[in-house]
UniProtKB/Swiss-Prot annotation:
Specifically methylates the adenine in position 1618 of 23S rRNA. The lineage of its organism: Bacteria, Pseudomonadati, Pseudomonadota, Gammaproteobacteria, Enterobacterales. It is an enzyme of class 2 (transferase). It is found in: Cytoplasm. Belongs to the methyltransferase superfamily. METTL16/RlmF family. GO terms for molecular function: 23S rRNA (adenine(1618)-N(6))-methyltransferase activity. One of its GO terms (biological process) is rRNA base methylation. This is Ribosomal RNA large subunit methyltransferase F. It comes from Escherichia coli O6:H1 (strain CFT073 / ATCC 700928 / UPEC). InterPro entries: METTL16/RlmF (IPR010286), rRNA_lsu_MeTfrase_F (IPR016909), SAM-dependent_MTases_sf (IPR029063). One of its GO terms (cellular component) is cytoplasm. It comes from the Bacteria.
Amino acid sequence: MSAQKPGLHPRNRHHSRYDLATLCQVNPELRQFLTLTPAGEQSVDFANPLAVKALNKALLAHFYAVANWDIPDGFLCPPVPGRADYIHHLADLLAEASGTIPANASILDIGVGANCIYPLIGVHEYGWRFTGSETSSQALSSAQAIISANPGLNRAIRLRRQKESGAIFNGIIHKNEQYDATLCNPPFHNSATAARAGSERKRRNLGLNKDDALNFGGQQQELWCEGGEVAFIKKMIEESKGFAKQVMWFTSLVSRGENLPPLYRALTDVGAVKVVKKEMAQGQKQSRFIAWTFMNDEQRRRFVNRQR
């Protein structure tokens, strides 16, 4: 039986329910984590981080030709369909300048993470080239291990360590470099206490005890920063002005709709020429990203058609 997942992008490969028999063939580790729902249907034990990791391994191998993928304990294990949605909507945004999705786009992923998920999907789906930035040396090592373990990715994905505390684009975008877009899944919480409380809520909702590990665990830099998501994105907006001619579209996920008004005000303050909001939905989960540019329509057309 196949059921549509409401709201996923038309090009997303995950509209139907997971074909667990096929995914277990791709990654036999997954079989031990299968469960039955109250309706008697086979599912995955999503409360178990090892199950989610095994599912991700299978999905990335089966749909995105990533045969070797792993992350260290304690790092975020992202849901693949939602991450793919961001990539596909970003592709539509890039296509607006010329009418077609650019095949050789250069993308900057702010906070690439130990999982390297956005570059892996973007390289496979569109042949894009990625630069991934990261503050954590452990996350960077994990992402590099994934790249090195899969033929062809070394030519498509490069990584850079953000050494400047509090900086986002500064120190990462080099002089004379150009990017079609940046993307980011920013830290959500405004303190370690808030991050712990959020994890505790999810624990209770899943009926887990305190010692159970969770697939939405994560390192400090993945979960929180001073001032939370709004402060992080506002800092990104402030810095983006300095790279107005080097980047066509700056984008970031925004977890809550109520966080948008202060971000729109910040974008007005820096003189953004155009601001776009893309709504997304994965099942019951609503999400969105905002995009802004300092280039007008004609400048964006010229940028897309530039010599690379």
